[in-house]
Amino acid sequence: MSVAFASARPRGKGEVTQQTIQKMLDENHHLIQCILEYQSKGKTAECTQYQQILHRNLVYLATIADSNQNMQSLLPAPPTQNMNLGPGALTQSGSSQGLHSQGSLSDAISTGLPPSSLLQGQIGNGPSHVSMQQTAPNTLPTTSMSISGPGYSHAGPASQGVPMQGQGTIGNYVSRTNINMQSNPVSMMQQQAATSHYSSAQGGSQHYQGQSSIAMMGQGSQGSSMMGQRPMAPYRPSQQGSSQQYLGQEEYYGEQYSHSQGAAEPMGQQYYPDGHGDYAYQQSSYTEQSYDRSFEESTQHYYEGGNSQYSQQQAGYQQGAAQQQTYSQQQYPSQQSYPGQQQGYGSAQGAPSQYPGYQQGQGQQYGSYRAPQTAPSAQQQRPYGYEQGQYGNYQQ
């Protein structure tokens, strides 16, 4: 199948003729038909082989088109094979577009994405996009996540709520975890987190609302939300970087309070909402009131003094992320305060696993913020029996 490609490639640019291009297009058409046929039969190995050949041909043709501005004059009228490429290609009138449509079709086949959407993207972007799309489709599933990632990371430092979504994966996790937590709230969460949070996460207010909804949702489905939030703990790290988040978090908390169910619980939620949407959920599940109170007290302290800690803990954060699963104080040696807090969290029903990360991210930061500065080890050592046990550290 690659004979034409092999024979045409060595030729110089000046030797590219309409016959060569037409031959390549015919070969690509045949390759596409073979790919579709094998795909219908479930022969993935053959599909992959033909797709690689088709990809090379398309890259070659795209290179020719890019290097030869007059290539349009050499291209034949739209070949009939374009009619077989699918609904997206039926409306295309240029051979170069046909090439793109073919490329997008092969990409769509390999990635399972709708060819029409790919076709449109390629056609609009031009020949140079052909090679790009070859790889893009394969990465689209992940890029869709990572695409918002940059927004998250940007928003993360800017807004408190963002931290949760600060990481590209965070947003996804949140939405997924939320899905597990609650179908309806989750959809809201996802939308807010994915859209308003990302785009407006920087604003923070929307994010707060979104998070507050998260917290509220978390309360509604505390157990499940806890599960969903665990992934968030890792996300939390994104917040580490920004002290703003903490400040915003306080605001967040305020909003959360209003949004949250009870003043005490809302506190906990708000607390976490900042970066601890999970916290809020879990808190509600834990022993919301006591935690909440401790949060209120410690929250403010941590916020105020904890910013510097944030940066410190950020390092811990990363450790915490890995260590989150182990809440042991030892895990967060650098974040000694974390451990204590984590322990406190840990004591609180199993949510700790989530908290650990969060605590490191924020809960710890709070507790450690205040105490870490003064005596992280001490805090560590004293997880503080606090009625909340979890937040004992905070209060101290």
Curated annotation (Swiss-Prot):
Tissue expression profile of the protein: Ubiquitous; with lowest levels in spleen.
Top-level taxon of origin: Eukaryota
Region (Disordered): 72-162, 192-280, 311-396
Residue spans of biased composition, Polar residues class: 107-122, 128-147
Family annotation (Pfam families): SSXT
Position of sequence motif SH2-binding: 50-53, 353-356, 391-394
Region (Methionine-rich intra-molecular domain): 149-232
Compositional bias annotation for Low complexity: 90-106, 199-229, 238-261, 311-369, 384-396
Gene Ontology CC annotations of this record: cytosol; kinetochore; nBAF complex; nucleoplasm; nucleus
MFD domain, as annotated region: 246-317
Example of a GO biological process term: positive regulation of dendrite morphogenesis
Residue numbers spanned by region N-terminal auto-inhibitory domain: 1-148
Chain segments carrying region Necessary for nuclear localization: 334-396
Record motif SH3-binding, residues: 371-379
GO molecular function terms noted in the UniProt entry: transcription coactivator activity
Subunit comment: Homodimer. Dimerization may be necessary for its function in neuronal dendritic development. Interacts (via C-terminus) with CREBBP (via N-terminus), EP300 and SMARCA4/BRG1. Interacts with the nBAF complex. Association with CREBBP facilitates transcription while the association with SMARCA4/BRG1 suppresses CREST-mediated transcription in resting neurons.
Family of this protein: Belongs to the SS18 family.
Protein name: Calcium-responsive transactivator
